[in-house]
Amino acid sequence: MQEWPPTAQQLMRSRYTAHVRGDADHLFRTWHPSTRPADTDPEPGNEWTGLTVEAITAGSVQDDDGVVEYTAYYVSQDGEPNELHEVARFVRRARRWMYVGPADVV
């Protein structure tokens, strides 16, 4: 069994890797049930090319809430370069970090 990421930033990075690999199961497991959509499959045809962490607020091993601002870069099916910028909220419940969504989601 794979160890659960100990910080919000590490969970966010593992979720980026899940997008790169097309690992819908990891995305499902790490998405908070209160905001998780029915379909967590990554967008087919996107080639993820990079990730930059812009800022981190809390989200350490001692915290129960955290915010990670990041930009993920990808090339879409039509060959166009794109980026996804998000200020993402994470919560830790039962010693596991979960992705909630954009930081304005309660």
Segments the model singles out, each with a brief description of its role:
Residues 1-44:
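Core segments of small alpha/beta cavity-forming domains
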Residues 16-19, 26-28, 70, 74, ...:
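Aromatic side chains
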Residues 3, 15, 21, 62, ...:
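Exposed, flexible binding/inhibitory loops of compact, secreted disulfide-stabilized domains
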Residues 82-106:
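Short beta-strand edge/turn micro-motifs at domain boundaries
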Residues 43-83:
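Surface-exposed, charged secondary-structure patches
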Residues 31, 48-50, 97:
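Tryptophan-centered motif/residue detector
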